[in-house]
């Protein structure tokens, strides 16, 4: 795909994205491919670094994001990416190669010899969910990830011997589901995340969902809260300072608390941490009323393990890509089911 030929459609996509008109921005396969070529590489590098950092932190604090030790090498890692697309697929493919060297593809010479592939379970079971149909793009990415690059017929023997795919075909299971996330039923959510610990991501997605509907997004997060297994992690990467207008902002005093926008952290804390958890004032109130309010407070089943208002994924200046690469700035939130 010639990057120069994409500039016209990229301008159109960018205009629609800035207006939050996602259906128009990504309404055709051509637009989705162009979006993947232009914006996904920078995002994928940022996403992979965030998850890798979370993995390292988990090892230090003795909890697991995605099992990576030699003893756990036979376990299948599980990731569910809500609002995901090509960037998530790129990020997790790179992360899998980093965490599991055994997931690497075989050299082209071995494949040419016709040796039978070893039967093994998948290292990573990944599900991507979005309202746009990313399946054709993801299928192409998966094929490119698990197939050795094409070499010239004049390539040297050493070049052929060292030519291998990023991943072996059996190492990654990538499934795409096309859903309106906020319309997913409880059964669909359960069937998607399963009953074992998994990493659930919302990369540059949750702020958009909350801006569409606070009640519907809150209800969806409660569905996740109800079904995610102990040890699961919800990881959010979003725009720095991403906020959601208060429903009462239009009628409230501009200087009042009611008029202030909600932050993602505040909205998620209320769902997952049961906040606000301030002590109930008892003065002038009956003991029974106070006891009932205390009893009705939600049980806290999550711990907040990451809260970074600003993070920058700074790229090496020597890194080159035919399209364009940028340093990505974002905020990170992560919650662990306990």
Report the location of each language-model feature:
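Domain-level detector for long C-terminal conserved domains
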Residues: 1, 107-124, 130-338
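N-terminal auxiliary segments of SAM/dcSAM-dependent transferases
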Residues: 1-26
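Acidic, Ser/Thr-rich intrinsically disordered and amphipathic helical segments
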Residues: 5-8, 12, 30, 34-35, ...
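Ordered, helix-dominated protein-protein interaction surfaces in large eukaryotic regulatory proteins
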Residues: 15, 37, 41, 49, ...
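Class I SAM-dependent methyltransferase Rossmann-like catalytic core
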Residues: 17-76, 87, 93-114, 245
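Class I SAM-dependent methyltransferase "Motif I" SAM/SAH-binding loop
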Residues: 73-76, 80-89, 128-131
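A short secondary-structure junction signal
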Residues: 91-94, 138-140
